[in-house]
Amino acid sequence: MNSILKTIFVASTFFLFAFSCSETSADSDTNNDNGQNEEPAPNGEKEWQLVWADEFETEELDADKWSYQFGTGRDEGLTGWGNNELQYYSDREENIFIEDDMLHIVAREENFEGMNYTSARIRSIDKGDWLYGRFEIRAKMPEGQGIWPAIWMMPTESVYGGWAASGEIDIMEYLGHEPDKVHGTLHYGGSWPDNVDSGDDYQLDDGKFSDDFHVFTLEWEYGEIRWYVNGEHYQTQNSWYTDGHGFPAPFNQKFHMILNVAVGGNWPGNPDDTTEFPQKLIVDYVRVYQFK
């Protein structure tokens, strides 16, 4: 980690942090109002506290926490969602539902609105937006060539410019033809095509991510982002940039969460004769913690 806090300031920083916390209401707010350049107290003086969660215990998707995205991305100026994806996103029960206190996002092969595949994509924008935190998701993956589920984050307001100048945080991406591996990635730099990315992957010693549930965790602090699978830390990022702005931009603004299953696209490739449908991403819970 870059040395953001010098040793000589540790004691005074903690005193100010503790004093400010004593003046703050104990009630948790969905949105964190920390300043973009606020430096946290030392790790040893903080404690993660739950500030937002969805345990999927309702009969339908909680509209106070999530919004749907629809279609092919054409309405957003991103036909194929910018990746030449093949699915149409809907809010139909065929594509998204809650059962046994778990969220199911289902990719299907079917003709719908001019596309050959359907799926679902939801996001927490303006309902769950956070600057820094611990993000924990327990989920079971689908599998198959061309199947591309993701748990990721985008800036709520693109204050530094278009993608990826304002950043993207991929908590977990998974390619269905590599069922024992997941990826964690940051996107930043300039606006496309001057964007860059950095990341790593985690591979199971045995079995597949589609065999059972696994816990995917991301810890995001000032100047450092860490990834975990089932509590095992597998990468840390603490060096990035965005054009025209100093570190730690762009990862010093509020981001929201996105859950989706894409079909096809530039990275996974398209489904083939080996791909079986339907395919499900099943999410047990989403939990967000922040230091208080």
Q: Which residues are covered by each model-predicted region?
A:
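GH16 jelly-roll
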Residues: 26-292
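Short, conserved catalytic or interaction motifs in soluble domains
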Residues: 23
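Bacterial N-terminal signal peptides that target proteins for export
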Residues: 1-9
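C-terminal motif of bacterial Sec signal peptides marking the signal peptidase cleavage site
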Residues: 18-20
